[in-house]
């Protein structure tokens, strides 16, 4: 089984990461192509296309301008936010971290896809951002889907577990994915209606990654006992391709 999660806008390069063997992102040639486009934008253009403040635009303009000389750090220890904070990566054993290295991918607008210990540099680029004529979803779709197919071909249980947002999981081409895609949904019962509460769903996704790592889980079936923040598996609302967890 291979799980996917979305990258995060928030990065933390200040927190120290444990010493471990780092890896290199798979698609650096394509990353550099995107960087060439990003480096051509003015601060004002970056502010508009990324919908960010002038201050953030200046920060990212400087990042892209001197990208090669920026510090780097393992992706799983760098991304912050609700999903990553609830993985509690700093508490994982080396064995659990090594398991994640071969069973988790992080989808990124700039890097396409990352293994947890792939090194990244400071950047901001959401998958929905349009760069001139480049649609990032289309730009990455074939490469990422083919890469996932190659990884799953070597896995014992050939499932792709989708813990990413719609914005990022859209980079997977279902028509070219050779193996079963299992989507995970976290919903809450509000006055008889099932709704997705974004912040709680993100926390639950991170907690599920932690459970996968700590228990070396390689099958969606083994996740049905997952419980966090009051979520519980719903047989009624689930199917072979959809795992639904409901909070009453």
UniProtKB/Swiss-Prot annotation:
Belongs to the UPF0246 family. GO terms for cellular component: cytosol. This is UPF0246 protein RC0754. It holds the Pfam family H2O2_YaaD. It comes from Rickettsia conorii (strain ATCC VR-613 / Malish 7). GO terms for biological process: response to hydroperoxide.
């Amino acid at each position: 089984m291979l799980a996917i999660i979305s990258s995060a806008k928030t990065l933390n390069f200040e927190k120290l990461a444990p010493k471990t063997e780092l890896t290199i992102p798979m698609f650096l040639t394509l990353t550099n192509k995107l960087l060439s486009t990003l480096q051509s934008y003015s601060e004002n253009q970056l502010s508009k296309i990324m919908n960010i403040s002038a201050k953030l635009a200046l920060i990212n303009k400087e990042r892209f301008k001197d990208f090669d000389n920026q510090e780097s750090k393992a992706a799983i220890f760098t991304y912050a936010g609700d999903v990553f904070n609830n993985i509690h990566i700093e508490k994982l054993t080396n064995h659990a971290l090594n398991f994640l290295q071969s069973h988790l991918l992080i989808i990124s607008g700039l890097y396409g896809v990352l293994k947890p210990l792939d090194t990244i540099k400071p950047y901001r680029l959401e998958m929905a951002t349009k760069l001139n004529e480049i649609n990032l979803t289309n730009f990455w779709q074939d490469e990422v889907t083919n890469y996932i197919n190659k990884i799953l071909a070597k896995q014992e249980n050939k499932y792709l577990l989708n813990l990413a947002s719609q914005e990022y999981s859209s980079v997977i081409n279902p028509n070219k994915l050779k193996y079963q895609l299992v989507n995970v949904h976290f919903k809450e019962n509000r006055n008889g209606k099932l709704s997705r509460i974004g912040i709680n769903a993100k926390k639950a996704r991170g907690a599920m990654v932690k459970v996968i790592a700590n228990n070396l889980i390689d099958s969606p079936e083994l996740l049905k006992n997952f419980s966090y923040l009051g979520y519980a598996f719903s047989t009624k609302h689930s199917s072979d391709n959809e795992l639904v967890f409901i909070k009453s």
